[in-house]
A protein has these predicted regions:
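C-terminal hydrophobic helical "lid"/dimerization subdomain
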Residues: 249-253, 292-347
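Mid-domain Rossmann-like dinucleotide-binding core that forms the NAD(H)/NADP(H) cofactor-binding site
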Residues: 79, 83, 140-220
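Glycine-rich cofactor phosphate-binding loops and adjacent beta1-alpha1 units
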Residues: 163-164, 206, 211-285, 346-347
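Short N-terminal strand-loop motif that marks the start
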Residues: 1-63, 123-125, 129-132, 346-347
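Glycine-rich beta-strand-centered segment in the early N-terminal region that forms part
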Residues: 20-34, 48-98, 103, 136-139
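Short glycine-centered segments of the SAM/dcSAM-binding site in methyltransferase folds
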Residues: 82, 170, 259-260, 287
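NAD(P)H dinucleotide-binding glycine-rich loop of Rossmann-like/cofactor-binding domains
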Residues: 91-174
């Protein structure tokens, strides 16, 4: 099979490798679609501890496809079934898995991060992931493209739950990449009175408006326009959907009284210490939190929204590539020349 394997920093190779063998309790997925994440971009640009010259890694963790083979008796699944896969699983149960927070367990593992993932024609789904319920059947009318994007959208759903967006809220999303637009979509679905997207890239703001003309977009410095749009009150909800330290400082400074701020975009390790005015948090009663990954419950809820037609994600895809052009797909994301890149595979 063809696979995109990371050997180290800026060393991604398309290779023909054997189709994975599966053990009892495992599932072999024939990939239908795999989408590119910012994590894939960073892994290529900076390298990763689990991708080395001696032990290269098939990257990619957003996936959907068809069950090609099942190892033994795995109740609930059949060969030929269309599914999408949550990539994060827990090989050893813990209190966090019991409480539904297995995605926060420091000992978690993920396809495409710790072991071979979705940028290949076939993916082995480990038995622990199968037993945990990470393989979700998808309806016939849901495309593999949308099903693969349940993973990033469910990360956004996690942030939506933390933010507690209510009807009539003014929501500011800083970052107009695919994740930022996903935040905008779910904010509108939640009944937000105004959904405002801020970014430095005019092309991405234009794409966001093309997806939904009700989105209000602001390029560059946001302060004056936010004052005008909110009557000086500030946004009720602010999502920082970009890896920029100054944006986190800004969010605390411009949030409304009793505002909720979610730090969604992680920061580079050498820039993760950020100045925040704690008096603003104190006297304005701000709630400042962060989110990462998603629980299986949130993954399932997101899939349901897509299945029921409440959320459409197809319009986020701006480039499609064969697996041989994985590096081009990643470059399109890295250069902000579009929104979401996907890899398409033969049916």
């Amino acid at each position: 099979m063809k696979a995109a394997r990371l050997f180290g920093k800026n060393d991604l190779r398309i290779q023909d490798i054997p189709v994975p063998e599966i053990a009892p309790g495992e599932i072999l997925l024939r990939t239908g679609a795999a989408s590119v994440c910012g994590t894939d971009v960073r892994m290529l640009q900076h390298g990763h501890a689990h991708a080395t010259f001696e032990a290269p890694l098939v990257i990619g963790h957003e996936m959907a496809g068809t069950i090609e083979r099942i190892g033994g008796d795995v109740p609930g699944y059949t060969v030929g079934q269309r599914v999408c896969v949550a990539p994060n699983y827990n090989p050893v149960p813990s209190q966090l898995t019991v409480s539904g927070n297995g995605h926060l367990d420091p000992n978690y593992r993920a396809l495409g991060i710790h072991e071979d993932g979705s940028f290949a024609e076939y993916v082995r789904i480990p038995s622990h992931a199968v037993q945990q319920g990470n393989v979700f059947p998808i309806a016939d009318h849901v495309s593999f493209t949308e099903a693969a994007m349940v993973e990033p959208m469910s990360c956004v759903y996690n942030a939506y739950e933390k933010a507690g967006t209510r009807p009539g809220d003014i929501v500011l999303i800083i970052g107009a990449g695919p994740i930022g637009v996903m935040h905008a979509k779910i904010s509108k679905l939640a009944g937000a009175g105004k959904v405002i997207i801020n970014d430095v890239h005019s092309e991405r703001l234009e794409m966001a408006r093309g997806i939904d003309s009700s989105f209000i977009t602001i390029q560059g410095d946001v302060r004056d326009e936010i004052k005008r749009l909110t009557g000086g009150a500030g946004p009720d909800v602010i999502i920082t959907a970009c890896p920029v330290p100054e944006v986190q400082t800004l969010a605390v400074e411009i949030a409304a009284i009793s505002g909720r701020i979610v730090f969604f975009g992680g920061l580079p390790k050498d820039r993760a210490v950020v100045p925040l005015d704690s008096n603003l948090i104190h006297y304005r009663q701000l709630v400042v939190t962060g989110t990462t990954r998603q629980s299986l419950r949130q993954f399932q809820a997101t899939l349901a929204l897509i299945t029921e037609g409440a959320l459409c994600l197809e319009d986020l895809v701006t480039s499609t590539h064969p697996v041989e052009d994985t590096e081009k797909a990643i470059a399109a994301m890295a250069n902000a020349t579009g929104l979401k890149s996907r890899l398409a595979f033969a049916s």
